[in-house]
A protein has these predicted regions:
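Alpha-helical assembly-interface signal, strongest on the long, hydrophobic N-terminal helix that forms
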Residues: 2-84
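Long, compositionally biased low-complexity segments
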Residues: 64, 72-504
Length: 504
């Protein structure tokens, strides 16, 4: 009986031992699993933290002059070299990642880390989205609807109207010439004895002034023209520029017709910028950070060195010489002003009468009375052109010129036109209307957006390269955002991928 009790006791004791052993194993397994889980999540948190710090560290190395001068944040993916270096960027990302891992509490539990994949958002994409985001920040609210499309349509219509009027006057003169009956020899002899009234033809004077060069004609006498020149062949997005057109003969209707045709392209609505509010805000940005032909008239603390002085003019025209860019912009400005000034003359009975009287004297002197209509129109075009030269000179002196002039804002009287010299083109002291910079905005707003932004990047690159440490700077290499994936091997036998991204 006693032996039987011992057997039963030993049996139950063995069962308890097995149960306790199993319980211990279960508890140990749970604890080990919890430990592994704790280690895994701790390593995971450290890995994610290291990933964020890695991309933070990379983008913190933005190009300082790009931020200071042009308010643009971007990282140079070329590291001061011409070519983009993804390998070097990946190495820097991984190096910073590993250093942050080593500084973590669970560094011993992260056995190995590698960079699995890196993707970059470039500052300059096809739609200019990220560049525009940077340069239009806090400027969009200042952009308003200025009725630009209406203005350009009006200019185009008036330019076409002037061209059509000249064509009609020419056709009428030719018809009158064909219908003119032959005079008798006696009438001719009698007419030949008549004393002809003489008048100086202002067309000769304006033609002479113009054909000495647009800078001579349209710049005030004291204006100092920049002689800076910069090759743009080594920029990220090179392209060719546009130069000013040739001579004009104000006594030749075909020459004037050619002038109107060239101007028609400037006012072509097909070239009109039909972009977003951001595109318009970008024009205000350009005015703030780039110089133009009147910047020297302002008090400015900006002492940055620049490859060109007429930067806005370069964006509009794209030539490598300041002088050529100024010529091209003045040509556009003359087109706009001349069309509007001619419209004013055609709507002024007093001015029309003055011109017609002079045209009659010139026609009589030339014995071509049936061409008086053509001569009168050419005189009106000449007057409008001379007034436009005066407008350009005033604008370059920091004065204002209204889009549509009145008798009160008109500078050159017809009496002055009949005795015109180049010095008379100066003296307009306009204080109402638009400044030179305002007219530049019009040209920028109607310019092709890709052309405009490419040329803007040319100036940014070339100006930054003037600093020795950025001599090989290229905007095409600049990164705006990064997305990276790191592969990690943990001591608990798990692998974990960290994916993180950041942009400016």
């Amino acid at each position: 009986m006693i032996e039987e009790d011992k057997t039963i006791k030993n049996f139950y004791s063995g069962q308890i031992t097995v149960f306790m052993l199993m319980l211990f194993m279960i508890v140990s397994s749970v604890l080990i699993a919890q430990y592994h889980s704790a280690v895994y999540y701790a390593c995971r948190a450290d890995s994610e933290r290291a990933g964020r710090l890695s991309v933070d560290s990379l983008l913190a190395g933005y190009v300082k002059p790009l931020k200071e001068r042009y308010q643009i944040l971007a990282f140079d993916g070329g590291f001061g070299e011409k070519e983009f270096s993804q390998e070097k960027i990946n190495g820097e990302l991984l190096d910073v990642y590993k250093k942050n891992i080593q500084s973590s509490v669970d560094k011993k539990n992260i056995i190995n880390s590698t960079l699995d994949e890196s993707l970059f958002t470039m500052l300059i994409e096809n739609d200019w989205r990220f560049l525009l985001r940077e340069i239009t920040l806090n400027r969009v609210e200042f952009v308003r609807e200025d009725g630009l499309e209406t203005l350009m349509k009006m200019l185009k219509d008036k330019n076409n109207e002037a061209s059509d009027t000249l064509q009609e006057e020419r056709q009428e003169a030719e018809r009158a010439s064909q219908e003119e009956t032959s005079e008798s020899e006696e009438d001719k002899e009698d007419g030949g004895n008549e004393e002809k009234e003489h008048v100086d033809d202002p067309r000769d004077i304006v033609t002479d002034i113009w054909n000495r060069g647009i800078l001579y004609a349209a710049c005030p006498g004291e204006y100092q023209i920049s002689d800076k020149e910069c090759s743009m062949g080594d920029v990220s997005y090179p392209e060719s520029g546009q130069e000013m057109q040739g001579e004009i003969d104000f006594k030749d209707e075909e020459s004037i017709q050619g002038m109107f045709k060239k101007w028609d392209n400037i006012f072509d609505s097909d070239n009109m910028l039909k972009g977003t509010v951001e595109d318009a805000a970008a024009v205000w940005y350009m005015e703030e950070v780039f110089h133009n032909g009147t910047t020297h008239l302002k008090d400015s603390s900006d002492n940055y060195e620049r490859v060109l002085e007429y930067e806005i003019e370069y964006i509009i025209a794209g030539n490598e010489k300041d002088e050529e860019n100024l010529k091209s912009v003045l040509w556009r400005l003359l087109a706009l002003r001349c069309v509007m000034n001619l419209s004013h003359i055609l709507l002024s009975p007093e001015k029309q009468m003055q011109v017609t009287e002079t045209a009659g004297v010139i026609g009589a002197a030339l014995v071509i009375p049936y061409f008086i209509g053509v001569i009168a129109f050419l005189l009106k075009a000449t007057w409008a052109f001379a007034e436009s030269l005066s407008d350009c000179r005033a604008l370059l002196r920091g004065k204002k010129v209204p889009i549509i002039k009145s008798d009160a804002t008109w500078h050159l009287s017809w009496e002055r036109m009949l005795s015109l010299n180049v010095n008379m083109l100066d003296g307009y002291e306009g204080n109402e209307g638009m400044t030179y910079e305002d007219y530049l905005k019009i040209f920028l707003l109607i310019q092709n957006r890709n052309e405009k932004y490419r040329r803007m990047t040319h100036l940014i690159e070339k100006n930054i390269r003037l600093q020795n440490e950025y001599s090989n700077f290229y905007l095409k290499n600049c990164i705006y955002g990064v997305q990276v994936t790191f592969q990690n091997e943990f001591s608990v036998g798990e692998n974990y991928k960290v994916q993180t991204g950041l942009s400016y």
